[in-house]
């Protein structure tokens, strides 16, 4: 469904009023006082308190389709709670008063601080779109030496884009992609500027969003006393005065003085430094352009052009995707050399390769003897080509020939999670912070598959070896050969062919062949427990633990009041015990025997990101093996450290699903 958003950027009276020039326009509407309208009002009323309690950023949803409302709220980092709440309330009221029947809206507003609210009838977190954008400019002109101003402008904006988009923080907060800065202008004026991206973007996406916004500003607003560029996921504003609280929280730096090259000579001519500053960048850009042009043509000769592959699966009949010939794959992998072999999965081997343009890739060569090879190939191409998320491995192309079926993925340098997690010599590299971030990243990836992507995907084979780690240890879910598309109204499906990894499969799948999104939840629960203990779930069959499996072992520790005995010894002295116990609690809820008792991924995300939410009491897990007269007794109050009962939050477990 196409989305058309309402834009506001209410600042000083010097900016053109968006209220008059940009009425709420949309292709979809709701009926006033309908369920959608009620949900919209409820989630907008909840945003201020949740944004301030979640480091300046919060995203959530409320209701059930087709009346589900998704919303995001964000304030500047360092904003006082009262100012943030006031700004968000003002933004909410503006939306409610102006967008009377529109299902989609976005507002950036400047009051005592700057804040943003966006809501929609479809999920948008994790998606990146450059357009549409809106421009707001001062009605007052500004005249100065253009050459001198442009030099100061370029230095300031380039520095700010780099600073704002270079965050490696895995947490979502309003401070993740943010900067505010000032620069001294030649005419004794001061230029004030701020940039901010929503934290669901990748650093590269934030960089592109802000770079394009600076370019747009140069086209619309240079020569004016100020202006703003706003997009779905970022905003840029520059003025000749401090605004919206942005400069009460900025990193202090002395005002930059005009460089020596800007000092006018008595002769009235440009200095050598000024000429060099203009000419050298032009020459460098020209050389880079020529090199890229030559490389692109060389690469184009060595590969086949984009071709169609007909994959009739669940309504997706035609994909346009890069097809590589087998010779190119052989060269890239050095004829599938053993030294390039990364691993072996259920349907084939994986090799590291380097394409002619220098791109490192992971090449998955499906087994020729696998009866399911052709189907798994079609399935994986169809699904992964439609999925775009930072916590999912990216498919770059494929090779399809009579005797070969090959998938080409992005190369992830740190191999898979099991490579570190289950190796006593390497598991120490995964401290608790990294493990906790990995759990969060996997949660976001599965949530995207289950709820936020255009298709509803059940992975069916979540395990440590299918979680890849990039250079920053950010997890990426891989291996979609067994994944299935779930119908909109289909909660449970059946299969006669039970495939997967024992220990990760839930009881209803092993016994009855039934799978659903709750099957992935069970697998994820087992995976969380493995991440905490640093042991494979199947190792508990041989270990002297008096338990038949991992979930039984954990359940006994839990009921005995000693859950921390599960923790990997390499991290036990430097972990956050409250976080560890909460993760064990969540994992036990994920591995409940009855699928209905397992939380969905949006609820799991809520549990991980909001420590004040009270978790329900787990019952004995699926595949729990009782010992003698063991009974399922449990005191829930023992393991809710730091949790406080809050009426609003009690409701959010079922109604407000952050992602």
From Swiss-Prot:
Residue numbers on the Cytoplasmic membrane side: 296-659
UniProt-listed Gene3D superfamilies: Gnk2 domain, C-X8-C-X2-C motif, Phosphorylase Kinase, domain 1, Transferase(Phosphotransferase) domain 1
Active site residues according to the UniProt entry: 461
Ranges in the topological domain labelled Extracellular: 19-274
Gnk2-homologous domain residues: 19-124, 131-243
Membrane-spanning parts: 275-295
Compartments (UniProt record): Membrane
SMART domains: S_TKc
Sites carrying sugar chains: 26, 33, 50, 59, 111, 145
PANTHER family, A to Z: CYSTEINE-RICH RECEPTOR-LIKE PROTEIN KINASE 14-RELATED (PTHR27002:SF1064), RECEPTOR-LIKE SERINE/THREONINE-PROTEIN KINASE SD1-8 (PTHR27002)
Similarity section: Belongs to the protein kinase superfamily. Ser/Thr protein kinase family. CRK subfamily.
Protein name: Putative cysteine-rich receptor-like protein kinase 12
Organism: Arabidopsis thaliana
Gene this chain is encoded by: CRK12
